[in-house]
Amino acid sequence: VRVTVMDDLTDSGRGVNLVAGEEKVLNGDEAYVYIRKRETETFGSADERLRRQEQFITSFITTLNTSSIERESQAVAIYNAVSDYLVTDVDFETLVATLLGYKYTEDNMYTVPGETVQGSEFEEFYPDEDALEDLIIQMFYKEVE
């Protein structure tokens, strides 16, 4: 998955050194570190990781939709690679057709509104209840005329 690296990230155990601003195709350990790593002693690192995850997912979906997934062998390979992590009653053909028709952008991604504060031991997230209710209504309800 191609991304513009958002944060300097190093994991010597995995042999990964990513530099902020670098345009990079992430595979294997680099992708793992990019979406999982956070500095627990740095306030806000969970939010930074979430931004990277959103970026990675968006790029991943875009790559799937613009790649050679139309070739059935590619779709089968992708399905087989993730099938151990899927629980679904949707058959393979329907799943592929749905994915091919899905247009995914960062505009389709929602984050619970709220505030992260430093607690006595850990970061604590407090949702904005009113804004969350508005988001739920916007996403799941349609006004009836």
Positions of the model-derived regions?
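Solvent-exposed, polar/charged alpha-helical surfaces in well-ordered, non-transmembrane soluble domains
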Residues: 33, 55-62, 76-80, 84, ...
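Flexible, polar/acidic helix-loop-strand segments at domain edges
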Residues: 1-73
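Generic alpha-helix detector with strongest preference for long hydrophobic helices that associate
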Residues: 16, 37-41, 59, 63, ...
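Short flexible/disordered coil segments
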Residues: 43-49, 68-77, 128-145
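C-terminal solvent-exposed extensions
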Residues: 21-22, 26-27, 81, 85-145
